[in-house]
Swiss-Prot record:
Positions of transmembrane segments: 5-24, 31-48, 53-71, 84-106, 116-135, 151-173, 178-195, 207-226, 232-254, 263-282
GO cellular component terms given for this protein: plasma membrane
Name this polypeptide is given: Putative sugar uptake protein lin0212
Family as reported in the entry's similarity comment: Belongs to the GRP transporter (TC 2.A.7.5) family.
Domain of life from the UniProt record: Bacteria
Subcellular location: Cell membrane
Swiss-Prot/TrEMBL keywords: Cell membrane, Membrane, Sugar transport, Transmembrane, Transmembrane helix, Transport
Lineage: Bacteria, Bacillati, Bacillota, Bacilli, Bacillales
Length: 285
């Protein structure tokens, strides 16, 4: 049962990009809907828990949530530029590299020689995996430009995601205490990011995108439980498996085309990212 709970984040976060893409809408509508869903879920959690708030917890968690919106909105943009099956392994790999480097240099993780060797070997595998998943066999001017835009967009996205993780870690804030102020920060940032949009912010797609927002929040809550049930290393490693669902789902359910060579390299790349993520989880233990 513990492993089932620990797999919920991977399932929720793996399916979420597929649901967002099926619902549709512009990235600004998607981020507003997703953050509204996360806020609704956070309010429900708040009612049944007893979080402890200080000014530091509220402000830092709010800023952390704003960084998440930066990361998530740019991930949505990348879906339109390079597709879900390329975006998710690239995004996961970049996040693993970013958070791991912060962990080593800011929080002095991997404190032994063996853990340093294991951790940096994992980063090498992840970087190789990133290159493999971004491979394009038949490049034309349009697809090449989209890939360049997608990589830049995902670099910005990764800054957001890494900031989201690092800020609460820096101030040693419990995930339970952070949930509501983080969600408020997500909503405020999502609304601010959409101010200059020419499209309507509130459409049918906006409200439907509350569903993936609840899915993301469910995965986040399950991760808090799984860290206690199976340990941070195992919980973290299992949560990375969602990239398999989203990558394969992008190809099978969203109809994203791959040549045989691209498909083989994507599969190898995803496997390397998962192995690297698992090794990082072990190095964290």
């Amino acid at each position: 049962m513990n492993i089932v709970i620990a797999l919920i984040p991977a399932v929720m976060w793996g399916i979420m990009p597929l649901v967002v893409s099926k619902i549709g809408g512009k990235p600004r509508q998607q981020i507003i809907g997703t953050t509204f869903g996360a806020l609704a879920f956070a309010i429900g959690v708040f009612i049944f828990t007893n979080p402890e708030y200080t000014a530091t917890i509220i402000i830092a968690s709010f800023i952390s949530g704003a960084f998440w919106s930066l990361g998530q909105m740019n991930q949505f943009r990348a879906f339109t530029q390079v597709g879900v099956s390329k975006t998710m392994p690239l995004s996961t790999g970049m996040q693993l590299v970013g958070t791991s480097l912060f962990g080593v240099f800011a929080f002095h993780e991997w404190g032994t020689t063996s853990k340093l060797i294991l951790g940096f070997s994992a980063l090498a595998l992840i970087i190789i995996g990133i290159f493999l998943t971004s491979y394009q066999q038949h490049k034309d001017e349009n697809s090449g430009q989209n890939m360049k835009k997608g990589i830049v967009t995902l670099l910005i996205s990764s800054v957001g995601y890494v900031g989201y993780v690092v800020i609460t870690r820096w101030f040693d804030i419990s995930g339970w205490d952070a949930i509501l102020p983080q969600a408020i920060g997500m909503v405020v940032a999502g609304l601010l990011f959409s101010i200059k949009s020419e499209e309507k912010r509130f459409t049918k797609q906006t409200w439907l995108n509350m569903i993936p927002g609840v899915m993301w929040a469910t995965g986040n809550l399950a991760l808090l439980f799984s860290n206690k049930l199976v340990g941070i290393a195992t919980g973290f490693s299992l949560s990375q498996m969602g990239v398999v669902i989203s990558t394969i789902g992008g190809i099978l359910f969203l109809g994203e085309k791959k040549t045989k060579k691209e498909l083989i390299l994507v599969i190898i790349g995803v496997i390397l990212v998962i192995i690297g993520g698992t090794m990082i989880g072990i190095a964290k233990s």
